[in-house]
Amino acid sequence: MNYLIVISFALLLMTGVQSGRDAYIADSENCTYTCALNPYCNDLCTKNGAKSGYCQWAGRYGNACWCIDLPDKVPIRISGSCRGR
């Protein structure tokens, strides 16, 4: 029984756990990407490893790109001010 637990744990560590999140993609200054059309955001999001993306109109940060299943390594908009604009 203990062998089964150890083997299961080892397999979990070897395969790794990847998580994604749905969020506004941000640049290095904590600013969202302004958009008008969905194809722009979908292209931006998928190039950064997300499954898809679209332009969120009149959202919390205005018209900004929203990504679906964005990898953890990609910066997202967090609370606080946009430092670049």
UniProtKB/Swiss-Prot annotation:
TM segment ranges: none
InterPro entries: LCN-type_CS_alpha_beta_dom (IPR044062), Scorpion_toxin-like (IPR003614), Scorpion_toxin-like_sf (IPR036574), Scorpion_toxinL (IPR018218), Scorpion_toxinL/defensin (IPR002061)
GO cellular component labels: extracellular region
SUPFAM superfamilies: Scorpion toxin-like
The LCN-type CS-alpha/beta domain, residue ranges: 21-83
Expressed in which tissues: Expressed by the venom gland.
PROSITE patterns reported for this sequence: LCN_CSAB
CDD domains: neurotoxins_LC_scorpion
Keywords annotated in UniProt: Disulfide bond, Ion channel impairing toxin, Neurotoxin, Secreted, Signal, Toxin, Voltage-gated sodium channel impairing toxin
Cleaved signal peptide residues: 1-19
Record-linked Pfam families: Toxin_3
GO biological processes: defense response
Disulfide cysteine pairs (residue numbers): C31-C82, C35-C55, C41-C65, C45-C67
Function per UniProt: Alpha toxins bind voltage-independently at site-3 of sodium channels (Nav) and inhibit the inactivation of the activated channels, thereby blocking neuronal transmission. This toxin expressed with the pET-14b vector has low inhibitory activity on sodium channels (11.33% on rNav1.2/SCN2A, 15.96% on mNav1.4/SCN4A and 5.04% on hNav1.5/SCN5A). When expressed with the pET-28a vector, this toxin has higher inhibitory activities (44.12% on rNav1.2/SCN2A, 25.40% on mNav1.4/SCN4A and 65.34% on hNav1.5/SCN5A).
Family: Belongs to the long (4 C-C) scorpion toxin superfamily. Sodium channel inhibitor family. Alpha subfamily.
Domain description: Has the structural arrangement of an alpha-helix connected to antiparallel beta-sheets by disulfide bonds (CS-alpha/beta).
Protein name per the record: Alpha-toxin BmalphaTx47
Lineage: Eukaryota, Metazoa, Ecdysozoa, Arthropoda, Chelicerata
